[in-house]
Structure formats: structure tokens, C-alpha cells
């Protein structure tokens, strides 16, 4: 990890690496001990000109995202709140407000993640009925996927239009866009 100046590391993905502190505990979910490790990484990142940064793939509560995005740690965190939301105005507004607040708290730029390998793709999600199920993100989309697309009517044309509109919204927001 000391040679971060290599061209082939542009897409280095450390979400599969789970650092284990010396006490033997396993920080699989938002453990405070992991921040000591990330502060050590920051020392290494700062040895380069310009300093390197990393983006945390941390599915944590929005009120803890700032810890990962801090300039003393990784520098950015994926804001998954945006990817969790349905095509419902109030849900999208909430995600945007949380993302901007988290960025201000950390002193980092805000990030916007529309989709990734952990959630159904936005065009598929938005093609299905948009029903908010408290405590469960994309419940209808997950059910639809698990049952081979047979539980709900999919409107692909509508899903594509909504996905395009959502991406344009994402690109208009301040910060970094991860589509």
C-alpha cells in the first residue's frame, strides 16, 4: 500500500479489505477502531503531491458519515442515502439535505451515489411502483428481483425516464457524482 503513485491503482477497491485491530475484534460495521487505521492511511496519503484521498464505502447512519469523510481520514464517503431513496420527492429532498449537512460537518465535498453493486439499478427501481416502506429500502424492487420479475408490473420506459431525470438531478448537485 506504500506505492500509491502507480497508474494501475486508479481503480483500487479496498471495500473487500476489512482491517482487523490488534485486539482481535472484527470491525465489520462502523467500529470506532477503524478510524485509527484510516488516520494512519491519511499520513501515507499526505506524503504524495498532491495528497491522495480515498472514498469510504461505509453504509453507516448519516450522522456518522462525517467521520469517514474527514480530511484527517479518507477524505470522502459515498453518500448512499441517495441510492436508498425511491422516486418520491420528499425522500430525494431528505437525501440531498442529509448529504449537504454531512459534507459541511466533515469539511469534505458532498458525494452522490445513485446506484452501485449493492442495490437494484436505478432504472429498474424507478420502473416499479414507488412505495415507501419504512425501514426497508427498495422493498418492492428486491422482491421483484427475487421472484424473477413476476411480482410487479415493470414500466421500463418510465423507469428509464426517471433514471435519466435522477442522474441530471445528481449532476446538478454540489460535490462529486458517482452514477
Predicted features by range, described:
Residues 1-179:
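Active-site and adjacent substrate-binding regions of carbohydrate-active enzymes
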Amino acid at each position: 500500500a506504500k506505492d500509491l503513485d502507480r497508474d494501475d491503482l486508479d481503480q483500487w477497491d479496498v471495500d473487500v479489505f476489512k482491517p482487523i485491530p490488534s485486539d482481535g475484534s472484527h470491525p465489520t460495521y462502523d467500529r470506532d477502531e477503524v478510524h485509527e487505521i484510516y488516520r494512519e492511511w491519511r499520513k501515507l496519503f499526505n506524503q504524495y503531491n498532491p495528497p491522495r484521498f480515498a472514498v469510504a464505502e461505509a453504509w453507516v447512519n448519516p450522522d456518522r458519515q462525517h467521520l469517514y469523510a474527514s480530511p484527517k481520514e479518507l477524505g470522502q464517503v459515498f453518500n448512499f442515502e441517495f441510492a436508498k431513496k425511491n422516486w418520491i420527492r420528499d425522500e430525494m429532498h431528505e437525501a440531498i439535505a442529509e448529504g449537504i449537512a454531512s459534507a459541511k460537518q466533515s469539511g469534505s465535498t458532498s458525494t452522490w451515489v445513485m446506484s452501485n453493486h449493492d442495490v437494484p439499478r436505478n432504472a429498474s427501481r424507478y420502473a416499479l411502483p414507488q412505495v415507501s416502506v419504512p425501514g426497508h429500502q427498495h422493498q418492492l424492487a428486491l422482491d421483484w428481483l427475487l421472484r424473477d420479475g413476476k411480482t410487479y408490473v415493470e414500466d421500463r420506459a418510465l423507469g428509464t425516464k426517471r433514471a435519466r431525470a435522477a442522474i441530471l438531478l445528481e449532476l446538478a448537485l454540489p460535490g462529486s457524482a458517482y452514477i
